[in-house]
């Protein structure tokens, strides 16, 4: 029964990518069975506007969706995700809630005004440069975090721990606590 439940894709470019790489039985459709076998998805620069079905790929450990036309990305069901590159999109909000395994995040060159890292306790590498962030709290992240927050013209304050390495523009105050 599980093998015969198929995913309906809203975005033709995302569907084409998935069919090209994950259609195990070559029937021209992606079943939930096929989706749950996918651990890595590398789909940069493919003109993808929506990945609304990304939650069906719940065993994903790595996702590279950089250089597309994404405005949002709902990863709440992708709780095993360790590496995420969603840079060079138009994402205004990124919900990382529940992504406790996330080690690397590249969300540079988007339209982010807020980046909530409360659930990102394992995060070791962050590039959030080139956004519209106003404040950034890195304290919930790994004490070995390396972060690049440059190119955020509205960023006034970054909160971090003494053991974390943070780079930001000269107008940004870095407060160590």
Stretches with model-predicted labels:
Residues 56-59, 80, 90, 101, ...:
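Glycine-centered tight turns that cap/initiate beta-strands
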Residues 46, 68, 89, 110, ...:
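Consensus "Asn ladder" position of solenoid repeat domains
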């Amino acid at each position: 029964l599980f093998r015969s439940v198929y995913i309906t894709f809203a975005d033709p470019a995302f569907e084409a990518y998935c069919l090209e790489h994950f259609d195990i039985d070559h029937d021209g459709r992606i079943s939930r069975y096929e989706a749950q076998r996918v651990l890595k998805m590398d789909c940069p620069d493919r003109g993808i506007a929506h990945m609304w079905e990304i939650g069906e790929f719940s065993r994903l450990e790595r996702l590279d969706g950089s250089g597309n036309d994404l405005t949002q990305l709902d990863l709440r069901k992708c709780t095993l995700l360790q590496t995420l590159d969603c840079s060079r999109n138009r994402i205004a909000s990124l919900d990382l809630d529940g992504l406790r395994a996330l080690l690397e995040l590249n969300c540079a060159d988007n339209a982010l005004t807020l980046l909530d890292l409360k659930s990102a306790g394992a995060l070791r590498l962050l590039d959030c440069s080139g956004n519209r962030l106003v404040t950034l709290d890195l304290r919930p992240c790994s004490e070995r975090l390396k972060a690049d927050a440059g190119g955020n013209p509205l960023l006034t304050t970054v909160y971090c721990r003494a053991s974390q390495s943070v780079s930001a523009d000269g107008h940004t105050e870095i407060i160590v606590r």
